[in-house]
Every structure is written in structure tokens, then in C-alpha cells.
Amino acid sequence: MKVLDLLTVLSASSLLSTFAAAESTATADSTTAASSTASCNPLKTTGCTPDTALATSFSEDFSSSSKWFTDLKHAGEIKYGSDGLSMTLAKRYDNPSLKSNFYIMYGKLEVILKAANGTGIVSSFYLQSDDLDEIDIEWVGGDNTQFQSNFFSKGDTTTYDRGEFHGVDTPTDKFHNYTLDWAMDKTTWYLDGESVRVLSNTSSEGYPQSPMYLMMGIWAGGDPDNAAGTIEWAGGETNYNDAPFTMYIEKVIVTDYSTGKKYTYGDQSGSWESIEADGGSIYGRYDQAQEDFAVLANGGSISSSSTSSSTVSSSASSTVSSSVSSTVSSSASSTVSSSVSSTVSSSSSVSSSSSTSPSSSTATSSKTLASSSVTTSSSISSFEKQSSSSSKKTVASSSTSESIISSTKTPATVSSTTRSTVAPTTQQSSVSSDSPVQDKGGVATSSNDVTSSTTQISSKYTSTIQSSSSEASSTNSVQISNGADLAQSLPREGKLFSVLVALLALL
């Protein structure tokens, strides 16, 4: 068997395959391992199984075996632990490898990795499609100063100038952050957050554009049975007496830029336009994937892209709803508190275009001297007539005997004699417009238009005058629901006025 064919099936870098064009004898172990990763090429065969779509984003720390990847059961050792993943080549023919259980159709990947050392030892992290599109990141153990980037389109190896080398500080001794951003218009390779290479989709050598799975593993490019070109590229012949050779992966982040359950080749053109997303769309979650990646790269977590979108939407809706409710409540409270509309009128009905019903204003009076039906209503004539909560407003009294005094947070003067010290509560509760009137200490609250009957006034005034006739200068103390106490002394003239009003009411 040709080593070129063997390496292609193994999904190893096509750059390596280029140097392996010469014939060589492959071992039975290598042949068996190679056949286990063989896939159906939809550009050459019909009826290939659709590719399972990732259609989400995730971060994997490999503290235990991962649901996202399958151990290909090649010879070698794979361990999981608190420090992440280790893949060890302990002897000849070992080739520990993990393959993703999903495909992405464009996406972004990040790996925190320390490459294996050792002459001829190759550490690999790459994307590959069923029709042999490929995007690579590779390290050779004998070179502790750089890593390599490469790409291929449809397995085309007619030219060999696709690979590039990038300087990096001791990659076999230190962990570094390597990132691939495979977008529709370009692919970008990053080292520790810095762009080191950009490939445009207008490349004359083609551009990867079909669904790809993720592979990672370690193998011996310097095996003495390999072609001379492969051994040279890998840095020389591998000395297995120096084994074991281990590569380490601390974390992997993967995002898919597309949505759907499966990706299918619609024809044999191999173009991205021919790819069909079952139940989704190509590039349908690009923006969401960027958000997911940012969260995951900063140590955050998400359950899935759909959950993330739903959560963001729900959160936004909740925030808006909360803000609106808070604003309405605050506005209503502010309106009632700042409206100084002490009004003396005949069976007057105070109305408002506002539908807010702060009917929970439950001020109580310890000593009610002029306890007419002092009514708090959410129906304020207009927001435009509001004054600040600390403002005072003088309202002329009416000649009628029936009074409706709208409660206010600050004293207001009626005919320059009577002052109301009744203030509505500043805390609003959700009470429907048809909720019953709450009466505490002679202060009635209702969201309906309020009227004060002659009988109510007469009764209340009479009762009040009798209970407080001995108190010439008593304090009218009002207990507001938030615990604040306000007290004002009612002038003597005010009492006389109250008596006069009560007598008129009896006529």
C-alpha cells in the first residue's frame, strides 16, 4: 500500500502526504488503524450518510471522557484528568486519536495545547471533510520554535505551497492558545490571540467549504518505514527508545456557524451552496456563535446556542417588563405624591387618562379632626399638571359643603386656613381597578372616581368634632405606610370652618 493513501485515510496532514508519495511498506497495525477512519466521499459516491451537525457551541476541559469525541481505539494511551487530556505515543505504531462526533459548517475553534517533543513526532489538530477539504495546525517535536498551518481543497495536492510556518515560544514546553476561525469569506489562524495567517476564499488553490469534523492526535512521521520525504519533513527518524512522547490539551472550544440536525451534500459540486442543512440554515447562527465563543473563552458556560438565545431573549423580555412595571409604579407613585390637588367641590369626580391605580395608599390618622372623606385616587387629571413631591400649591375652596380632598405628600392650604397633611403611601401594590376601598384611619382609597356624600361628611364631621372637642390644638398626625410620620397643628380658624361646613351639611 502507498503511504500517501495510508496517510490520507488516517486523516493526517496532506502536507505530510505530499512528502510520502514514495512507496513504502506499511505495517498491519497501521493498515487496521487507517481503515477504521475511512469515510464515504460524497463527490465520488452516492448515498453517503448525512453528517451530524453540531449546530451549537461548547467548551471541553477533558476532566473525564467527552461526549463530544470518540476514541478511535488506535494503539497508544489517552488519559483524562484535572489537568486536561494527554495523548501518549509509548511505542512504535502507537497513534492515539480522537475524532469528533459532529460536523461543523463553518465555525470557530480554540485549543490550549502543549505539543509533544521528540524527533519525528507529530502533534496534530485539524478539520477535515468527507470530500477531503482540510484545515490544519501541526507541530513537529524536533522543532521547538514554530508551528505549521496548512489547508487543502478536495484533496488536491497538485501544488505544494499551501503550508506556512509561524514562530512560537517553545511549543513543546509551554501551553499556547491556537485558534482557527473558519468563516465563509476567509480562514484565520491565531496564536495566543494574535492573527498569524489569513486565507481568502478567493484562493487559486481552492477554499475549504464543506462540513468538517475535528481530529486531534499524535503519530510518528519519523518512523523508519515512512518515505524519506516524510521523515525529513518530520525532522528526522524517530528513536523509540526516547519514548514515551506526550501531547497535552487543556481545553477545546468549538462553535458551529450553521444550524440544523444534519448536513447533506445536495450534489457533487462540493461547493458550500450545495450543502443542505436539515431543519436549519447554513451560516444561520454566526452572530450567536460569536457571542457563545466570547463567553466560553472567558471561562463562562452555556448549555446550547438555542438555550443561550432563548435565555437572552427571556432575560431581555423580563428586564423590559420589569423596567416598564417599575416605571409605571414609580410614575404613579410620583404622580400621586406630587399632585397637590386639595379640592373642595360638589360631588366632584377626579378623572385621568392614566390607567394606573395606586389604590394601596393606606395612610392612617391617629387623631382625625377634620375627617371628611379624604380620598386618594389614581385618577389624576393630567401628568402635565404634576408638581415635584416637595412643592406646595394653594387651592381656593368651593362654596359647596361637600369636599373631596386629594391627598398629597406635602401640606396644601385650602382658603389659607385649612391644611391637609394626608400623604399617600409611596409604595404601590397591584390592585385591580375594581378592588374594594381600603379604609384606614378615615382615609379611603379607591381607583374608581370618588364622590363624597353629604351624609358621610356630616357623620364623620360630627363624630370627629365630638371626639376631639376638648383638644383645641391637637396634632393631626398621619401615619404613612412606609413608616414616616407627618404632623401639623390645625389652626383654630380651621376648626370653626369645619364646624360651619358640618352644620351646612345638616341643612
UniProtKB/Swiss-Prot annotation:
Q: What induces it?
A: Positively regulated by cell integrity signaling through MPK1 in response to cell wall perturbation. Induced by heat stress.
GO CC terms of this entry: cell periphery; extracellular region; fungal-type cell wall; incipient cellular bud site; side of membrane
Keywords, alphabetical:
Cell wall, Cell wall biogenesis/degradation, Disulfide bond, Glycoprotein, Glycosidase, Glycosyltransferase, GPI-anchor, Hydrolase, Lipoprotein, Membrane, Secreted, Signal, Transferase
Topology in the membrane? Answer: Lipid-anchor; GPI-anchor
**Sorted alphabetically, which SUPFAM superfamilies does this protein's record hold?**
Concanavalin A-like lectins/glucanases
Which InterPro entries does the annotation name?
ConA-like_dom_sf, GH16, Glyco_hydro_16_CRH1_prd, Glycosyl_Hydrlase_16
Active site residues according to the UniProt entry: E134 (nucleophile), E138 (proton donor)
Q: What region holds the GH16 domain? A: 34-260
Where is it located? Secreted, Cell wall; Membrane
**Disulfide pairs?**
C40-C48
- Report residue numbers covered by any propeptide: 483-507
Activity over temperature: Optimum temperature is 37 degrees Celsius.
Sorted alphabetically, the Gene Ontology BP terms of this entry are:
carbohydrate metabolic process; chitin metabolic process; fungal-type cell wall organization
Q: Which portions of the chain have biased composition (kind: Low complexity)?
A: 381-439, 451-477
Give the record's glycosylation annotations as residue positions: N117, N177, N201
Lipid-conjugated positions (GPI-anchor amidated asparagine):
N482
Query: Superkingdom of the source?
Result: Eukaryota
Residue sites binding chitin per the record: E138, W219, T230
Entry EC no(s): 3.2.1.14, 2.4.-.-
Q: Where is this region: Disordered?
A: 329-368, 381-478
Q: Which PROSITE patterns match?
A: GH16_2
| Signal peptide (residue range) | 1-22
Other notes on this protein? Present with 44000 wall-bound molecules/cell in log phase YPD medium.
Q: Which family does it belong to?
A: Belongs to the glycosyl hydrolase 16 family. CRH1 subfamily.
Function (record text): Dual chitinase/transglycosylase that plays a role in cell wall architecture. Chitinase and transglycosylase activities are coupled. Required for the polysaccharide cross-linking at the septa and the cell wall. More specifically, transfers chitin to both beta(1-3)- and beta(1-6)glucan in the cell wall. The minimal number of intact hexopyranose units required in the molecule of the acceptor oligosaccharide is two and the effectivity of the acceptor increased with the increasing length of its oligosaccharide chain.
What is this protein's record name?
Congo red hypersensitive protein 1
The species this protein belongs to is Saccharomyces cerevisiae (strain ATCC 204508 / S288c) (Baker's yeast)
